[in-house]
């Protein structure tokens, strides 16, 4: 049986995670949050004092990537994420861990180490994969390819609200600077830079609600022969 795959790529804070989860629930597909994998690897390397030694200890870092002890659990509150048995669901969503992930994602050998782990998520009846290079690198055969973007300013505003909702302090200028720096790093990295696939459906969510974007996505996905 053919596995149907929907990819959602785009920059940090564009709403990929929220909408990927909604699509996966709507179609009853599996869900891959590739950003979580990079955040988990970045957090693990930081805990083992290796994040600042990527060049000198690359082989060791690659081994950590291949053996990463992670688990995803679905609960009434959403998806819980565990690293080495510890619940790190909130931790991996902080700005600091986002910076760890961006550093890790810029290393070709570490991206390759996570490649097969991501491919393994493609199981029947289907998969919704959210990330930066799902359509261009990991699942180029995807049935439906979506590129979700938004202005840096609107993404910063959303991120501040998200962090404040988690009880964390957040300053708009700092968040905006971080987003702009991550965009630059993601778009300019040597391997799998952030960009839409040639055949991607591009949505700018700057002035749209989640429900409006979701409807656009469902209409597009259905037109690509994936049915509910």
UniProtKB/Swiss-Prot annotation:
Its EC number is 2.7.4.25. HAMAP family: Cytidyl_kinase_type1 (MF_00238). Keywords: ATP-binding, Cytoplasm, Kinase, Nucleotide-binding, Transferase. CDD domains: CMPK. InterPro entries: Cytidylate_kin, Cytidylate_kinase_dom, P-loop_NTPase. The keyword Transferase applies. This is Cytidylate kinase. It comes from Acinetobacter baumannii (strain AYE). One of its GO terms (molecular function) is dCMP kinase activity. It catalyses: CMP + ATP = CDP + ADP; dCMP + ATP = dCDP + ADP. One of its GO terms (biological process) is nucleobase-containing small molecule interconversion. It is an enzyme of class 2 (transferase). One of its GO terms (cellular component) is cytosol. The keyword Electron transport does not apply. Belongs to the cytidylate kinase family. Type 1 subfamily. ATP binds at residues 10-18. It is found in: Cytoplasm. Pfam families: Cytidylate_kin. PANTHER family: CYTIDYLATE KINASE, CYTIDYLATE KINASE/PANTOATE-BETA-ALANINE LIGASE.
């Amino acid at each position: 049986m053919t596995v149907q795959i929907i990819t959602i790529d785009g920059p940090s804070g564009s709403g990929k995670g929220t909408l990927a989860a909604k699509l996966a629930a709507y179609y009853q597909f599996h869900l891959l949050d590739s950003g979580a994998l990079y955040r988990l690897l970045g957090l693990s390397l930081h805990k083992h004092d290796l994040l600042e030694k990527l060049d000198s200890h690359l082989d060791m870092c690659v081994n950590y990537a291949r053996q990463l002890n992670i688990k995803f659990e679905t609960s009434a509150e959403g998806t819980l994420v565990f690293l080495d048995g510890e619940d790190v669901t909130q931790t991996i969503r902080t700005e600091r861990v986002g910076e760890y992930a961006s550093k890790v994602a810029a290393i070709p050998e570490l991206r390759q180490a996570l490649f097969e782990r991501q491919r393994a998520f493609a199981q029947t009846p289907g998969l919704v994969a959210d990330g930066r290079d799902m359509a261009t690198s990991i699942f180029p055969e995807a049935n439906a390819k979506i590129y979700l973007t938004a202005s840096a300013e609107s993404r910063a505003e959303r991120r501040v609200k998200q962090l404040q909702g988690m009880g964390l302090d957040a300053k708009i200028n700092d968040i905006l600077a971080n987003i702009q720096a991550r965009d630059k790093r993601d778009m300019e990295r040597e391997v799998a830079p952030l960009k839409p696939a040639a055949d991607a459906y591009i949505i700018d969510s700057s002035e749209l609600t989640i429900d409006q974007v979701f409807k656009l996505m469902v209409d597009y996905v259905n037109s690509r022969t994936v049915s509910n």
